[in-house]
């Protein structure tokens, strides 16, 4: 505390020049004693606080400086929740025009702003306005400490909107371009803290922060790079911001792609996350690939860092949504590492993104389909199908449903014994899992050359295909009923004597179909629909793959007209089946 003591002693030489009142002289004497024993005393109450406060309100500049220095040193060592009585004199000092006092007062306030309760009280007491004024000054040390204090204040959610609307964002943005690295770090850190809500992000964009953040991606300082990449990643969460970025920041993607090769792991991770968020939009999905993002991503998903793996697999998942990227992703060598990530049982999220990416790649070209099967993806998904979290099962079942849509894939799936996984998955209590598995199963019953796998799985595992058909027919859920009826219709039209025999001689299935016909007929009659007029099933596209029907039914649950259409479709299929059986 030598600085403060020295200041007190210097001031005593100027007594004749600088007036000191008796109570100020007493406060100086007491404070010098307190400072000698500072480790055992509480400077936030009682005598020490009273002595400091007396000096703050003095007209003597040296005494004010001494008080500011004392507050700075004490708060650096002892940080805890304090009262208004402590903050008030510091806020008074903050309004001083003296640079020494400004530096120390900002430092003291920033130290106390580490405490969560103090953060709220400082803002409530009007601390933002003097801090903003100090940021707009010319003294680098003052700027640095003022910005640092606002950075701390902005970590409390209650303060974020108040800061965003206080006028602080424009000077913070300006200071982010400072030539002084400490000021730049604090300013970009403060801007980052303002990106955690949509409203504040909008204020930040309107304050002109985005071009500054993008320009600072080229900074040589890893902390500044980290703050800027993270801030931009958060800003890119909002669709409106992504559109604005696409219009105004043509170099953003190339800069972020370059940062995926940063020596700093956290910069690398945040750059990848920023690209993932941007890749929510179609245009960015293409641009990231054009900018050379794939080689970086294929390396990152094979790294040893879980955050890097998660960020990169989430990014490639979004990029793989665009059909034009599918072949390029396969050619870049993503299939083997993606299949390997399916074993990443410590991270459900990584598994989900990996399966989702594989699903997007599965239904592209014949070349990609062939490589997909050769990669072992189907085998691995089958292994995980019954032994993974529901979220992963949902992605796997969706992948199977997509694969089963393509006629060229059906026999390969059957040969891979996919029915051993699909049939048990139809028992899932999760409708996405059971519905996707059932849709895949139904599609595998349609337009195939070899029905041996269907026949051998008729009553096993877990009651087999027969059990699935019965359960779904009796589910009282229109989408599931439709899947079962559609599967029965496909089997009835298989031209396979054994399959047809199994259908025709299963009284439970036939009775369920007849019951469904009666139920749907009654529904239509009650709705006033003329079944004979509208029920020309010969003209309907009932032989299309089942996913389109399934999706349509899922979407048509609110409108009475759509409900009637769904009932009519179910009725038509029952009539086709019964016509065949008769």
Curated annotation (Swiss-Prot):
Domain of life from the UniProt record: Eukaryota
One matching Pfam family is: Arm
- Read off the Gene3D superfamilies from this record: Leucine-rich Repeat Variant
- Spell out the disulfide connections: none
User: GO molecular function of the protein, one example?
Assistant: identical protein binding
Q: Which GO terms describe its biological process?
A: Cvt vesicle assembly; establishment of organelle localization; nucleus-vacuole junction assembly; pexophagy; piecemeal microautophagy of the nucleus; protein localization to membrane raft; protein localization to phagophore assembly site; protein-containing complex localization
Coiled coil ranges (UniProt) are none
Where it sits in the cell: the answer is: Vacuole membrane
Q: Where is the composition biased (Polar residues)?
A: 550-561
Residues with lipidation of kind S-palmitoyl cysteine? 4-5, 7
Membrane topology reported for the UniProt record: Lipid-anchor
UniProt ARM repeat ranges: 37-74, 75-114, 116-155, 157-196, 198-237, 239-280, 282-321, 323-363, 407-446
Where primarily located?
A: membrane
Keywords of this entry: Lipoprotein, Membrane, Myristate, Palmitate, Repeat, Vacuole
Which portions of the chain have biased composition (kind: Basic and acidic residues)? Answer: 536-549
Q: Which InterPro entries match?
A: ARM-like, ARM-type_fold, Armadillo, Vac8
Annotated region (Disordered) at: 528-561
Q: For the lipid attachment N-myristoyl glycine, which residues are annotated?
A: 2
Gene Ontology terms: cellular component: fungal-type vacuole membrane; membrane raft; Myo2p-Vac17p-Vac8p transport complex; nuclear membrane; nucleus-vacuole junction; phagophore assembly site
Q: Which PROSITE patterns match?
A: ARM_REPEAT (PS50176)
Matching entries from PANTHER family are given as: VACUOLAR PROTEIN 8
> What is known about what this protein does?
Functions in both vacuole inheritance and protein targeting from the cytoplasm to vacuole.
Q: What protein name does the entry list?
A: Vacuolar protein 8
Native organism: Candida glabrata (strain ATCC 2001 / BCRC 20586 / JCM 3761 / NBRC 0622 / NRRL Y-65 / CBS 138) (Yeast)
**Gene name for this UniProt entry:** VAC8
